[in-house]
Regions:
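Short, intrinsically disordered, charge-balanced linker/junction segments flanking boundaries
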Residues: 72-73
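N-terminal, active-site-proximal structural segment of metallo-dependent hydrolase catalytic domains
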Residues: 1-69
Length: 73
C-alpha cells in the first residue's frame, strides 16, 4: 500500500529549520504534497529531499500573495 502525505509547511525554509526533513524521513511516505512552500528551489538545498530518495517537482508562486506547492515522489 502506498503512503500519500499532504502537509502545509507554511514556508519550506522555516520547516527545514525545524527538522521537517527528519520528520519526513520517519513517515516513509511514497508521495508527499507540500502546500505554501513560499520559496523557489534556488533558495534552499533541494538535496535534503533527493538524499531521502525523492524526485522533486516544484511549482513556486509567481505572484505576490501566493505561496506555491511541491510534490515529492
Amino acid at each position: 500500500m502506498s503512503v500519500i502525505l499532504t502537509y502545509n509547511v507554511n514556508g519550506i525554509r522555516a520547516a527545514l529549520r525545524k527538522d521537517f526533513d527528519k520528520w519526513l524521513k520517519s513517515t516513509n511516505a511514497d508521495i508527499v504534497c507540500l502546500q505554501e512552500i513560499k520559496a523557489n528551489p534556488q533558495q534552499f538545498d533541494e538535496s535534503v529531499f533527493t538524499d531521502l530518495g525523492y524526485h522533486c517537482y516544484w511549482n513556486p508562486a509567481e505572484n505576490k500573495g501566493y505561496s506555491g506547492v511541491a510534490i515529492l515522489t
